[in-house]
């Protein structure tokens, strides 16, 4: 039975940790509320916070619930223990992908080195957790990830993975996502700290996301746009020359948030591949502004068109019945294509040309002969 003395600040931390390890979510939440969240970043053994303990829980369901509870209640995501390790570092060592995804969503730093110079990326590579490593390099492929950084022993993440024979980790680091992350870091855009120096620990009073990390409001903005709610991101898309197809079947907020972080499941990918969203020229769905949507599937269309969401935008040189089909990836969802028609302008460029596959779609009506379709090949 819980006694009043168990709710004093010092004993409250112990009570909360015991409730968490016993899987008592309601009791843990009660202790947090009773102490006005004053223990949320208190230290336990080895200087670890409740968040660091939560990422190590063996049960996946309880682990996800407690990690989300602590993060939503304001736990500092980048605090360090006595060995300089963060919650993300501990989660990467154990290969707990669900915890890693939540920590990155709340601005966890994948380059925060511990006292031995090992970053979370290095821990994932050394322990052979290929799925965790692939998620990290995909999520930070545009923001940059210093994959060439060495620990105190002079080893990089790639060398750690290769020395232990972790082929999936080597592939993740040397594949297209790893190369993109390393190239973005090499450009030196918005560098957090000088090379070789560990990132400073975040204090509870000053928890601003790093400039290179995706802040939560920005992720929410992407999620609203992906959820078909329009809003600020939707209006920005109109002005940039890219036309986004509407639809109530776009992912809801929570699922879109995970997609924006690169957390793409096989089930999610299969659901989007299953339905072909085709746009009919001169159909009731067309509004004249490049925003069309229908469930029709073009007879005789190539398999790439029949298995992927398709957007339509007016072709610059075509007649009223011609158009340009485009399947373009959102920069924040690497495996999920966006319903975006590719129009000429600043958005076209080397990336489009390098990944585009032009297909000529002949009649019958309502499609005119010579309608041009451009489908981006999946990056492997």
Swiss-Prot record:
Keyword Lyase attached: no
PROSITE patterns the record matches: ANK_REP_REGION, ANK_REPEAT
Entry keywords, A to Z: ANK repeat, Phosphoprotein, Repeat
Ranges of the ANK repeats in the UniProt entry: 11-40, 46-79, 83-112, 116-145, 153-182
InterPro entries with a match to the protein in the record: Ankyrin_rpt, Ankyrin_rpt-contain_sf, Dendritic_Spine_Reg/Scaffold
Compositional bias annotation for Low complexity: 181-203, 216-226
Sequence segments annotated as region (Disordered): 181-256, 309-368
Residue numbers carrying Phosphoserine: 193, 294
UniProt xrefs under Pfam families: Ank_2 (PF12796)
PANTHER family from the UniProt entry: ANKYRIN REPEAT DOMAIN-CONTAINING PROTEIN 63, ROLLING PEBBLES, ISOFORM B
Record-given protein name: Ankyrin repeat domain-containing protein 63
Organism: Homo sapiens
Source organism phylogeny: Eukaryota, Metazoa, Chordata, Craniata, Vertebrata
Gene symbol of the encoding locus: ANKRD63
């Amino acid at each position: 039975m819980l006694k009043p003395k168990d709710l004093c600040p010092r004993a409250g931390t112990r009570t909360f940790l015991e409730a968490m390890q016993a899987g008592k979510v309601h009791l843990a939440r009660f202790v947090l509320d009773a102490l006005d969240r004053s223990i949320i970043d208190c230290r336990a053994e080895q200087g670890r916070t409740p968040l660091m303990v939560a990422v190590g829980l063996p049960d996946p369901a309880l682990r996800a619930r407690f990690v989300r509870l602590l993060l939503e209640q304001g736990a500092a995501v980048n605090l360090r223990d006595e060995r300089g390790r963060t919650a993300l570092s501990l989660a990467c060592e154990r290969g707990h992908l669900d915890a890693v995804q939540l920590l990155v969503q709340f601005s966890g730093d994948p380059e925060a080195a511990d006292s031995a110079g090992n970053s979370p990326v290095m821990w994932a590579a050394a322990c052979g957790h290929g799925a965790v490593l692939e998620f990290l390099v995909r999520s930070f492929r545009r923001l940059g990830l210093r994959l060439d950084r060495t620990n105190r022993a002079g080893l990089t993440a790639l060398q750690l993975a290769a020395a232990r024979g972790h082929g999936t980790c080597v592939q993740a680091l040397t594949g297209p996502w790893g190369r993109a992350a390393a190239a973005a870091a090499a450009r030196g855009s918005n560098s957090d700290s000088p090379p070789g120096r560990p990132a400073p620990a975040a204090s509870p009073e000053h928890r601003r996301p790093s400039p290179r990390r995706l802040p939560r409001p920005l992720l929410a903005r992407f999620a609203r746009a992906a959820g078909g709610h329009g809003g600020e991101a939707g209006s920005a898309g109109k002005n940039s020359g890219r036309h986004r197809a509407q639809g109530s079947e776009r992912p809801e907020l929570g699922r879109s948030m995970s997609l924006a972080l690169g957390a793409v499941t096989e089930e999610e990918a299969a659901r989007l591949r299953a339905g072909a969203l085709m746009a009919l020229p001169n159909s009731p769905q067309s509004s004249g502004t490049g925003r069309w949507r229908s469930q029709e599937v073009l007879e005789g269309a190539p398999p790439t068109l029949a298995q992927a969401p398709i957007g339509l935008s007016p072709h610059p040189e075509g007649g009223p019945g011609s158009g340009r089909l485009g399947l373009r990836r959102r920069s924040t969802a690497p495996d999920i294509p966006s319903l975006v028609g590719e129009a000429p302008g600043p958005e076209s460029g080397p990336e489009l040309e390098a990944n585009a596959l032009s297909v000529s779609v002949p009649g019958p009506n309502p499609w005119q002969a010579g309608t041009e379709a451009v489908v981006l090949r999946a990056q492997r």
